[in-house]
């Protein structure tokens, strides 16, 4: 890609990815909804709100005009919360031309249908551009500080996957390519729900054994769903599956894990969310419940998280429901 990469979404994750691409020497245009904040980034060369200790490399140019960004860039990467994903697509739809290719680094599911974000794109954009999704074990603050990170890019077009990987790849940010959009999307979405579950177990003081069991059984649940939806089950043993799951379930930088910890300690759900901020797993739990039900896939850990967040069981009841389940055959 000789033209700049357009990153749409200037939160912590969008800014971190812009920094990574900048360190890779690739020109970037970075847009955010808050025009004043984007102008401040252009002036101060730092995102003071989200990544105050991570200066922007020279190739990164904040752009407050979305129309100008889309006109200048052939390749676009959406990095917005899942709740804003569809509305952002509708904003982009009249601006996208045949030359454009569209990727996203949003982790979650469609709020309207419980389906994959790729299905939202297929519903909104006509004709459909080449698509890609970037996912993997990656906290924004660590990427922004240049700490070693590895992620996966899955795309409908191998050329797009390679170009997007090249835009980000440098010695501190490794990018692997895939063709499995379904598996990569599921890994990034389901892990947020499972991180709440492992946080609850740790908040209750259940220990390392229980945490390991939840991670392992949670991976099996994700694998069952991915197979039902036509994904490659091996994707879930890679960065976008197991890698992201382990990171999110074991490190307190994860907001989803921190919410689980709070619930395990007996704190109020609404108060915990208000204190932590946006917790993607809260929305995803309900969406995942619908997706698994439609696919006819049993996901007991994710189901208990859904029931707890919906207020239909207490934290203690959710845990007991899992502990009282009969044992079965070990699944791959």
Curated annotation (Swiss-Prot):
Keywords: Cytoplasm, Lipid biosynthesis, Lipid metabolism, NAD, NADP, Nucleotide-binding, Oxidoreductase, Phospholipid biosynthesis, Phospholipid metabolism
Enzyme class per UniProt: oxidoreductase
The protein, known as: Glycerol-3-phosphate dehydrogenase [NAD(P)+]
Gene Ontology annotations for the cellular component aspect, listed alphabetically: cytosol
Native species: Alkalilimnicola ehrlichii (strain ATCC BAA-1101 / DSM 17681 / MLHE-1)
GO molecular function, one term: glycerol-3-phosphate dehydrogenase [NAD(P)+] activity
Family: Belongs to the NAD-dependent glycerol-3-phosphate dehydrogenase family.
Intracellular or extracellular location(s): Cytoplasm
